[in-house]
Structure formats: structure tokens, C-alpha cells
Amino acid sequence: MRIVAGIARGRRLRAPKGRLVRPTADRVKEAVFSILESRDGCAGLKVLDLFAGAGTLGIEALSRGASEAVFVDHGRPSIEAIHANLETTGLVGEVLSMPAERGIQQLAAAGRRFDRVFIDPPYGEGWIAPTLTALDAARLVADGGLVVVEHGRGEAAAPEVGGLVQQIARRYGDTHIAVYRANERDEDEHGNP
């Protein structure tokens, strides 16, 4: 695993110890960021990396100029790998050691919003739909923001989840990528998005 582009290009990243984490392959990561580059990239944007694993997607976004990145994972080996990878690359990110659902709730309670969200849960465990639903309900994705979901063969990514509408679906071997765009929403009577 390595950083593909940006200020930390070529740096090797550490995978979490154990066999429970499946880091995003470099060729899939290159394809994801090629899609994002065609849609204003990541420079100056706020990024959320859920089920972060080694943090490769969020760290790649930081290397490409994202203004901030928050990494959420509850596995100790993953948290250790994210910290080590941030140190190796000299990049700075916020690391939350908790399940994705709790991370979404905590970030929403703090009024945070993100322009790019990466969701890369363990394949075949049914995390995609509830995570997209929680993201939409919490309104963590800024209007026009993009959510990139990585999933395995045989898992479905719904065409629409609330205000998140699938724009792109691609397949790279056994890995599938779905990219959602957050529709603009009106504020409620209290001025909240």
C-alpha cells in the first residue's frame, strides 16, 4: 500500500495487524481518486473516512490537499495503523476510536459537515445501507458533497438513500465502487440544514 499522488506520493503505508482488515487496493484507490478529480478533487475539502482500516483513503485525500480528515474505526489494530500512517506521511488527521454509527452521531452532534465521505466496511456484513441512512439522517454530507462506497460482489448499493443519490457505479474485479451525491436541502424553521 502506498500514497498514489500529492505531497506524500510514494510513501508506503502500514496495514493493520490481523486478518480482519482488507485495505483498499492501490488500483482501486487510483480509480476512486480519478473519479473524484473529475468532480473537483479533494483540495481544500473536509473528508470523513468511515471504517477507516489503515486510513488509506483519508490519507490519500490529505496528500492531495484536503483541508482536514476525520478517521473513524473501532479496531485497535486499525487505530494504531492510522496513527502510524499519519506519522509516516507527516500529515495530520483526527482519529476517532469508535464504531461508525457512534462516530456519525458524535460528529453530527458537534455540527460537523464533510465534502467527501469514504465508506469501506467489511464486505458482506450489511453495513452499507444503515451507514448511508445514518449519514443522510445526520446530514453529515455537505450539499453537493460526494460519498464513495466500496463494497464486494453480491452486495447492493441502493440507487438512492434519502438525499443521497447514486451517480456512478464501477467494478474493479471483486470490488465495487458506488459514488453518491448529496442533494441540496432546505433549512428547517430553526435555520438548521
Task: Name each model-derived stretch.
Residues 1-193:
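Class I S-adenosyl-L-methionine-dependent methyltransferase catalytic core
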